[in-house]
UniProtKB/Swiss-Prot annotation:
Highest taxon, organism lineage: Bacteria
InterPro entries per record: Ribosomal_uS7, Ribosomal_uS7_bac/org-type, Ribosomal_uS7_CS, Ribosomal_uS7_dom, Ribosomal_uS7_dom_sf
Pfam families named among the record's database cross-references: Ribosomal_S7
Protein's recorded name: Small ribosomal subunit protein uS7
SS bond partners: none
GO cellular component, one term: small ribosomal subunit
Family per record: Belongs to the universal ribosomal protein uS7 family.
Keywords: Ribonucleoprotein, Ribosomal protein, RNA-binding, rRNA-binding, tRNA-binding
Quaternary structure and partners: Part of the 30S ribosomal subunit. Contacts proteins S9 and S11.
Gene designation: rpsG
Amino acid sequence: MPRRKMVNQRAILPDPKWNSEILSKFINILMVNGKKSISEKIIYTALNNLKKKLNKDHLTIFDLALEKVRPIVEVKSRRVGGSTYQVPIEVRSSRRNALAMRWIIEAARKRKDKSMSLRLAKEIEDALENKGTAVKKREEVHRMAEANKAFAHYRW
């Protein structure tokens, strides 16, 4: 492996409406074929619908939903001797956010509703109530880590 210096991450510009970097990242992850304006419209519509329904601030709703979906530990495969072990490791904060966003978007895409903004709004609402596919995914990852706790000493 080459011994090069670590590359600095490019700063992400905050979204134009609410000036949030996390929301901007979410917009970029949701974007398909470079159509950012459509992605922004979907998210803003979903958050506006939730604001009307829950009477809370847009960003508060979004941050709470992300918090409920963020994983704390995950498992990684580690080969020791002739066998492969699933070793539980703690997740970095940047990866926590990325995984949570990805899981919410995947769960929203799998839903059967009319528009993506409705599906996204319902998935975020379910995440706030600790139910829904994204939260189930987090619990599944945590269960795997708990089941393989015996292999934690193989961490590297």
